[in-house]
Amino acid sequence: MPNDQTHPFRGVNALPFEERYDNFIGGEWVAPVSGRYFTNTTPITGAEIGQIARSEAGDIELALDAAHAAKEKWGATSPAERANIMLKIADRMERNLELLATAETWDNGKPIRETMAADLPLAIDHFRYFAGVLRAQEGSISQIDDDTVAYHFHEPLGVVGQIIPWNFPLLMACWKLAPAIAAGNCVVLKPAEQTPAGIMVWANLIGDLLPPGVLNIVNGFGLEAGKPLASSNRIAKIAFTGETTTGRLIMQYASENLIPVTLELGGKSPNIFFADVAREDDDFFDKALEGFTMFALNQGEVCTCPSRVLIQESIYDKFMERAVQRVQAIKQGDPRESDTMIGAQASSEQKEKILSYLDIGKKEGAEVLTGGKAADLGGELSGGYYIEPTIFRGNNKMRIFQEEIFGPVVSVTTFKDQAEALEIANDTLYGLGAGVWSRDANTCYRMGRGIKAGRVWTNCYHAYPAHAAFGGYKQSGIGRETHKMMLDHYQQTKNMLVSYSPKKLGFF
């Protein structure tokens, strides 16, 4: 059973999972109604690593039963008490950081250096952040006249559904769970079937800190478990992170029940480098080269991946000579080794999708500057899902510039001036992220305001602090993740309009 001690950690090379995971419902481990399980594999080697509950509508109903049974008491729990529980969750995660980071690496294939330095610290910080935000949240009082006052209260929605992706399994769960739980809601969460195990390690670790029914985790496939959750008339909100096509379906399901949605969907983010970045060979230029190479972070499996690079034509040759060298210096290898920079794609299906786009790019006439094929790392890793970091040169009308690949692939083109850079940057269906690099603050400001995207990194990229709003324009989504505004997204506002006058209005 979970306890307040550090859980045994046997090293990053030791499998961190149980042989089989049931669903976590009402504070207990509950076998799937059908009795069926599916096989989970690790992207590192392609080997089978355990069995996961294959849930259906009946399991979702059990989780909703538990959530509804808990919602009144949890919603009435004081903000101070809820915040203290959030802090305890963060503390226990921090004490078991190596265990959780290892579980993420085995489950997703990303390097242990990233899960240790980014995924888990960020996840922990989100619980602490929303504990603080909750304690600081205030209602309001409006004086209408001498005898009439309007009170405004923040109240939880009740029971909410959340569906998380496979690229940052635990971090994306914490992005959604922290504000929802802080706001006083009970949650039914469905992980991605590609990465179902790491979140269960986490649930086993912290599950006893929350009252039964506040957190419920049901594994399974999209149509079998995700659809029944998203279309249920027993949830007051659905939050989803994933592909835009699936997001449209989620929105359709929600519309049938007239419930709010938060959708964090696809992207094709431009990363724009102006000529002055190469004016000097200094720390800033080195930082810009790292910014270019950020397309390979997390194996390119990031919704904001800077997968389109725009370089001012006057510095193209100089910049790209150094950029290609930087990419070729990336160490690809066993994700469990601390010096590995890029690991495995999350699934064999994703690997095949990326390979198909490498073929598309070549057929479109794009020039391969480096990479362009699968990586065979030999030994036990030969069964894993590895792709070489790839740079294409082409133009923005190509499919590799317009369609989300979700892999370590970047497509590079040039621009003459700010106007052309802005035109190319905005020539996309998406609007999730963007990067602007320049030594000129005016250039950065004008470009940042002109780009139609929800997050514009300026002289940086892939930073995800809790106190910065994250979300998309256009077909990249609806609503925001992170930032204190997320607390409002999981609450509803009650207005009490109170008259203290003994006098009638006089209409009747």
From Swiss-Prot:
Annotated GO MF terms: acetaldehyde dehydrogenase (NAD+) activity
Active-site residues annotated for this sequence: 264, 303
Alphabetically ordered keywords of this record: NAD, Oxidoreductase
Known pathway: Organosulfur degradation
InterPro entries with a match to the protein in the record: Ald_DH/histidinol_DH, Ald_DH_C, Ald_DH_CS_CYS, Ald_DH_CS_GLU, Ald_DH_N, Aldehyde_DH_dom
The keyword Nucleus belongs to this UniProt entry's keyword annotation: no
Inducers of expression: Induced by growth on hypotaurine.
Pfam families: Aldedh
Main function: Catalyzes the NAD(+)-dependent oxidation of acetaldehyde to acetate.
Family assignment from sequence similarity: Belongs to the aldehyde dehydrogenase family.
Name of the protein: Aldehyde dehydrogenase
